[in-house]
C-alpha cells in the first residue's frame, strides 16, 4: 500500500488490501486461494465518514471521497467521487465553482438561523468557516477574536490568503446586511 502526502482519512475509514473470500473457499470444500492487491492513494486525498477502499484501487491526487462510499475502481486525479460503488461525480474545479455560489447562500441561511433560533444578532465568532466571505487577507488584524482560528483553518495556505484574498463583502457588517440581518 502507498499513501501520498497531505491525506486525511475521516472516522470509519477502512482500507483493505485483501478480502475474506478465502474463508468461504475453505469452509465450502474448495482450495485456499490468496486474494490480495495493492492500493495506491495519491497526494492531497481526503475522505468523509465511513469510506472503504478495496484492494487493487489507485486514487489520484487532489481527490475527495464522499461519505459511506465503497471504492472498488480507480479514481482519477482532481475528482469528487461518491457512492456504492464509488464513482466520479465531478471535477474538483467544477465542485469548487459550485461551492463558490452555494457557500454564500449557506452563510446567509446560517446567519438568519442564529437570529431566529437564539433571538440575537450573529457575532463574528459564530462564523468559523465563513470568514472568507468578509475578512480580506490584509485585514485579519481588524478581527483579533478570529485571527488564531483563521490561521488554523487555512493551515498551509494562510500566507497566500494574507497576501491575496479579497473577501466578497467589505466587512462583517456588510455581510450581515446582505444576509438580511438588521
Predicted features by range, described:
Residues 1-58, 84-85, 91-93:
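Flexible, glycine/small-residue-enriched loop-and-beta-strand segment within the central core
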Residues 5, 61, 77:
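Short coil/turn segments at beta-strand junctions that form active-site/ligand-binding loops
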Residues 18, 74, 98:
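Residues that scaffold the ATP/ADP-binding catalytic core of kinase and kinase-like folds
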Residues 47, 65-66, 81-82:
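Short, well-structured beta-strand-loop connectors
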Residues 50-64, 69-73:
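Beta-rich strand-turn-strand
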Residues 69, 77-79, 87:
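Glycine-centered loop/turn positions within well-structured domains
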Residues 77, 82, 94:
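Catalytic binding pocket for nucleotide-activated donors in carbohydrate/polymer assembly enzymes
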Residues 86-182:
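Terminal amphipathic alpha-helical/low-complexity segments used for targeting or macromolecular assembly
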